[in-house]
Amino acid sequence: MMRRASQERRTTETKIKLHLQLDESENISIRTGVGFFDHMLTLFAKHGRFGLQIEAVGDMFVDAHHTVEDVGIVLGNCLREVLQNKEGMNRYGAAYVPMDEALGFVAIDISGRSYLVFQGELVNPKLGDFDTELTEEFFRAVAHAAHITLHARILYGNNTHHKIEALFKAFGRALREAVDKNEKIVGINSTKGML
């Protein structure tokens, strides 16, 4: 069974259409109106081997905050929907990813509990139309909407672009590991028998 989810979200601030395919990696198309964010989401999908299509229009005359946060909410909602059946799933995933001088780390638990730990210094406040503080807001929105525990950490680096890129790639790789099925896991990967 293919694990897919689609969702539309319309508010007075944003209009978002998102389609996620966990087990298909061919189709990646991201258009949010925030160039750097599009680049990061494309890297996330490519390195996670996910199909991901996003069309978003936001109130960019204000700033990119609502667009970035709402895309995170919709992506998290789609993840929660597509991961309802957790039988045979690894549940946990972690990845270190270098990007030149920067090193990013992400660990994920598909636990049914929403939690974010974010650590990292982003010295450059803006990359194009993207306020770099929105990196944490995006991960918080995804974690809370998806009901996952997510730890994202920039261990070191100098270039802000490289630091954020390492995190998004690590997020894709860690999520891929967590959602993959494992034939050695019988039922749900929890002593409780449910998540």
Curated annotation (Swiss-Prot):
What keywords sit in the KW lines?
Amino-acid biosynthesis, Cytoplasm, Histidine biosynthesis, Lyase
Instruction: Name its cellular compartments.
Output: Cytoplasm
- Which InterPro entries does the record cross-reference, listed alphabetically? IGPD_sf, ImidazoleglycerolP_deHydtase, ImidazoleglycerP_deHydtase_CS, Ribosomal_Su5_D2-typ_SF
Q: Which GO terms describe its cellular component?
A: cytoplasm
The pathway where this protein functions is:
Amino-acid biosynthesis; L-histidine biosynthesis; L-histidine from 5-phospho-alpha-D-ribose 1-diphosphate: step 6/9
Q: In which family does this protein belong, per the annotation?
A: Belongs to the imidazoleglycerol-phosphate dehydratase family.
Q: What is the designated name of this protein?
A: Imidazoleglycerol-phosphate dehydratase
Lineage of the source organism?
Bacteria, Bacillati, Bacillota, Bacilli, Bacillales
